[in-house]
């Protein structure tokens, strides 16, 4: 089933990409209205939008999905129900396709809720307590966004149709559209894990690694960004951009700091995803929706490759995800190491790789835009942090001595895993330049002073050096993380966000429930209710029973008592 799914997904991916580029060249969009049924002149119509953006995005989703499924052929080979796993992944892709081609909030909700439900099934795929808790956190965080979309559907009843794309320029000044835009922003923030909904993304790493490669690169987490790209005209009309800009920059900064003090390989990559999502959100808020979409596509390519390399390393190290157990992997797994380093350099924005064409352009546009120094600082400092944790990953996993069992051997022998990685390596190297030529027929012309032009490269170099400084291990054990323990605890736990969004949110209702149970259900409620009534009736019945059992004694005692009274009355 893996090979069949790979073949069809790859075929559709190629077809959609060619069609998308053709639609882009001739500037063509297609609306398809499918009438499901008609009742007394009321038609139930399903609408699809087929334009270059939806076609190119679907082709990328299907290309990555095809390689992920092929990769799963080896990664999940010990799984008894691998066909079930593939079916769930295909349901995930179908939900994403619904979301991409829908200009209608009802059909968007089908894809949106489908993504949430299937992602829950995939996060809890390994049956243990950790996976279950992570799945619940993922599902409940995303339910907030689902509720926001449901409320926006209710608000759109005032317009007579749920096709939001028709109302951009006609009722853009209405109060209802303002509320709907706010609700869509809330939904996008939950799905794309922006502050304060960020804690579910690292927790979702409990899913199998092929799922992480698909979900956290091109599908689930980018759904919110894609929805905001579609709603971009509304963001510009109501001037909500400043809010998204601030949240996006804070998310980028927080996740960059957190990744520098994390030791779980998959969580580091998840935090890097969070950082790039913040970058997409922030540049989208300035009105550059095409740039955000461009970075979304390039990021999907190299992030899927990064997860695949991480999966290959974890698979060979018998499911160990701690980077402190790794070391000198470059000698044992050269292909994985090459792919891992190329994708890390793409993430940093190293020149002429896929990430460079989008990330460097975004940073140059920021230099050109009217942003204050705080936002400017957050952008470039977060870029430096990206280089820092990328170099730290290389330092811990690739270089140095092997820290795993001395008698343990591992290699790149798996054909399926290697094929999946090479398929993504090619597009991670050449995809950025190809897309920049195709998506921007007239290239962006950014004229800046030389020091601003070189600022990005300088930031990457300084960030790499900082990554070396904080991870360098000397014999005196003077580690940065031990010298600044409080700071490391704060940043390494995502500014205590998992505690705030789980423990503190649930503490009040859970403690209220506990004391209610103790005081009412198990206390006064029992005393005055079931148990109390039971005890009272048992006592009453026992008392009455004792009276019945003592009838003769009572009669005799009463007779003696009355005889005594009569004696007293007559003889005294």
UniProtKB/Swiss-Prot annotation:
It is a multi-pass membrane protein. GO terms for molecular function: NADH dehydrogenase (ubiquinone) activity. One of its GO terms (cellular component) is mitochondrial inner membrane. It catalyses: a ubiquinone + NADH + 5 H(+)(in) = a ubiquinol + NAD(+) + 4 H(+)(out). Its EC number is 7.1.1.2. Core subunit of the mitochondrial membrane respiratory chain NADH dehydrogenase (Complex I) that is believed to belong to the minimal assembly required for catalysis. Complex I functions in the transfer of electrons from NADH to the respiratory chain. The immediate electron acceptor for the enzyme is believed to be ubiquinone. It comes from Locusta migratoria (Migratory locust). GO terms for biological process: ATP synthesis coupled electron transport; electron transport coupled proton transport. The chain crosses the membrane at residues 6-26, 44-64, 86-106, 107-127, 147-167, 179-201, 208-230, 234-254, 268-288, 291-311, 337-357, 372-394, 422-442, 454-474, 479-499, 524-544, 552-572. Belongs to the complex I subunit 5 family. The keyword NAD applies. InterPro entries: NADH_DH_su5_C, ND/Mrp_TM, NU5C-like, Proton_antipo_N. It comes from the Eukaryota. It is found in: Mitochondrion inner membrane. It holds the Pfam family Proton_antipo_M. Keywords: Electron transport, Membrane, Mitochondrion, Mitochondrion inner membrane, NAD, Respiratory chain, Translocase, Transmembrane, Transmembrane helix, Transport, Ubiquinone. Its main location: mitochondrion. This is NADH-ubiquinone oxidoreductase chain 5. Signal peptide: none annotated. The keyword Transmembrane applies.
